[in-house]
Amino acid sequence: MAAAVRQDLAQLMNSSGSHKDLAGKYRQILEKAIQLSGTEQLEALKAFVEAMVNENVSLVISRQLLTDFCTHLPNLPDSTAKEVYHFTLEKIQPRVISFEEQVASIRQHLASIYEKEEDWRNAAQVLVGIPLETGQKQYNVDYKLETYLKIARLYLEDDDPVQAEAYINRASLLQNESTNEQLQIHYKVCYARVLDYRRKFIEAAQRYNELSYKTIVHESERLEALKHALHCTILASAGQQRSRMLATLFKDERCQQLAAYGILEKMYLDRIIRGNQLQEFAAMLMPHQKATTADGSSILDRAVIEHNLLSASKLYNNITFEELGALLEIPAAKAEKIASQMITEGRMNGFIDQIDGIVHFETREALPTWDKQIQSLCFQVNNLLEKISQTAPEWTAQAMEAQMAQ
């Protein structure tokens, strides 16, 4: 049957007639090829593609028929469709400028097949082949933005944040021109994930937190975004930015539903965190967040050591490296190095006396510390009152009435 299709195509290519008549006859041959199965179908479709890219066929007809051809292929088995897509791209390549729209459609469908197979890199590379900026066809902003975001997401799935960042940067140039709110959300999600993968944790936390307030996003996804914001904040380097983010999250009552709330509370209240308290939280982290730093410690270990060092600076006026190392559960030399780095980067106030082996912390103002402690106490009292009202609403109502009557 494939031979019959090839013969019909050869005869039609040498015949004359109006574009409408010829297009109708080619369409009948395409329908016949689609009806076949297995190897016969594959060979017939390849013959059809060869005919369409032949220069003897009018460009008006071949574009129209290749568009129809593209609408049929998603209904075929993925293995057949994939082979036909690759064959078509290869045959079209010498005349790719004439078939830009059809090539874009083919690449989108082929990428979808690779995505179903979880072959993320090939899916991304197929989409990269669409000439969004360099081709003759003018693509609309939403199409370009959606494609760039999809490429970035696929590279993230393939654990390649460098390539993902390159395409999210291209998307960032377009996102202000788009009025599609759903695409804007996809952009923010993808950008937050790129920052997360690139270990820019505090920036990622800010993006995730912003997403957690978007009403267009489903409630469960908003809570998921809040969870990511919390995890990234915990993993971020200690300093003013992180302290502000900890305060923002601690005041957000939704965080009390999250498994990592206990760690958030300890960090916000400047309490020392021990290694054995982190096991449950460490298990929640994504693979890229479990990576090790240059000194061999994990990202989480480093973040907690820096947090504990800041907490120690609020407990002590000065401390020897040996005592500091024991407090942080690390060697004294490592404690000195981290303290030195944090002071140099302006993330902690103090100075180091290397002769005596002591780190001196600059005294903090008492008033802001008292304010923070009072704020924390009020927050805890509010939580208790809410729990009492949930458990005994009638008693709470009576108590409130009695209070108002006084």
Curated annotation (Swiss-Prot):
PTM N-acetylalanine: at which residues?
A2
Give one GO biological process term.
protein deneddylation
Q: Where is the PCI domain?
A: 197-366
* Disulfide linkage: none
**Predominant location:** cytoplasm
Which Pfam families does the UniProt record give?
CSN4_RPN5_eIF3a, PCI, PSMD12-CSN4_N
Q: Which UniProt keywords apply?
A: Acetylation, Cytoplasm, Cytoplasmic vesicle, Nucleus, Signalosome, Synapse
Q: Which residues form the signal peptide?
A: none
Q: Name one GO cellular component term.
A: nuclear speck
Record-listed N6-acetyllysine modification sites: K25
- Where is it located? Cytoplasm; Nucleus; Cytoplasmic vesicle, Secretory vesicle, Synaptic vesicle
Give the function comment from the record.
Component of the COP9 signalosome complex (CSN), a complex involved in various cellular and developmental processes. The CSN complex is an essential regulator of the ubiquitin (Ubl) conjugation pathway by mediating the deneddylation of the cullin subunits of SCF-type E3 ligase complexes, leading to decrease the Ubl ligase activity of SCF-type complexes such as SCF, CSA or DDB2. Also involved in the deneddylation of non-cullin subunits such as STON2.
Self-association state and partner proteins as the record states: Component of the CSN complex, composed of COPS1/GPS1, COPS2, COPS3, COPS4, COPS5, COPS6, COPS7 (COPS7A or COPS7B), COPS8 and COPS9. In the complex, it probably interacts directly with COPS1, COPS2, COPS3, COPS5, COPS6, COPS7 (COPS7A or COPS7B) and COPS8. Interacts with TOR1A; the interaction is direct and associates TOR1A and SNAPIN with the CSN complex. Interacts with STON2; controls STON2 neddylation levels. Interacts with ERCC6.
The family note in this entry says: Belongs to the CSN4 family.
Record-given protein name: COP9 signalosome complex subunit 4
Q: Which organism is it from?
A: Mus musculus
List the lineage, top down.
Answer: Eukaryota, Metazoa, Chordata, Craniata, Vertebrata
